[in-house]
Structures are given as C-alpha cells and as structure tokens.
Amino acid sequence: MFLSKIELFSTPDSHKWQKRMTIELKRTNSENEDFYNLVIDLEKYLTHADEKAHSECKPYNKLETIKHVIVAFIDQKPIGCGAIRQFDKNTVEIKRMFVAENARGKGIGTKILTELELWAKELDFKVSILETGKMMPEAINLYKGNNYKQIPNYGQYKGMEKSICFEKEL
C-alpha cells in the first residue's frame, strides 16, 4: 500500500523539456526487500565517502532495531529511504536516510524526512534527533533546510569527531 503520491517537474535545463514524475512513498518496516537493497547502496556510499568514520558508526545502524521505514519510488523503482526508531520515551531517531545518486536534487530527501516526522508525531513522539557525517554536506544542508538545529553529539556518537548531530521539535 502506498501512502502518498507526489508529482514533481524535472527541468534539467530551463530552455529544454519538462518531465513529470510521480514519487510514491510507502510505509513499511525493516524487513522490506526494497529498503534492504537501498541500505546496501547506502553502505557502499558511506564506505566510499569515509571508510573510517563509517566503520565507527556501523554498529549503531542495525536494521533489527528499526520498525518504521519509508521507501520512495519513482516509476515503481525504489529510489530512496529513511527510517525512525525510538530513542527514548519522547524522542525518535532518524536513521538510514538515503536517496539514489540518479534521483538526487529533486526534493526526495525532504519528502522522506517530512513523512518520517509526520509518522513520528502520529506515534506521539515530540522530538526528532539524528546523526550524520561531517563529510556529508548534502545531508547537513537537508537537515538544516528542514529546521534541524545542531546539538552536541549524543549517546554513542559522543567523542566521534567526524559525526554531527541535529535535533528538531516535532
């Protein structure tokens, strides 16, 4: 079951064509095969971006602890994902945010993040937190652009120099 459909226009050049694409968002869980395959792509991307920093964080990204997942599709092909997991009674942690390279720059990350925040509110969470790498400027811009504020590194990320953490009241 798809949660929502969002139509976007893609304009690679203002003097050329416009293409309508439909993004579908699906609520699921960490057992979803499309999510699993996107996480494999995410792992490859993170390892390439900074192998040492990624290896430090890897133990904290186990899929078994994730129950709420959004998978984004264009033309029925999975192109992005994100997840939430409970951090404490009032706080949800954003995990496994990823958009395939060929689908970036279209606002898909924002759509996934917005849907995750909505789902977290439906589950009565009040605050959203997350960690990303300092070597991920696109991710940092995504979170800042969606009103996340930088906070001191929390939990397992304390002392990790290459991590940066954010928070947002929902």
Per-region residue spans from a language model:
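Conserved GNAT acetyl-CoA-binding A-motif
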Residues: 113, 120-132
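Acetyl-CoA-dependent GNAT
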Residues: 22-95, 100-101, 113, 153-156, ...
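Conserved catalytic-core motifs of GNAT/GCN5-like acyltransferases
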Residues: 30, 129-134, 140, 144-165
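Ser/Thr-centric signal marking residues that sit
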Residues: 81, 110, 132
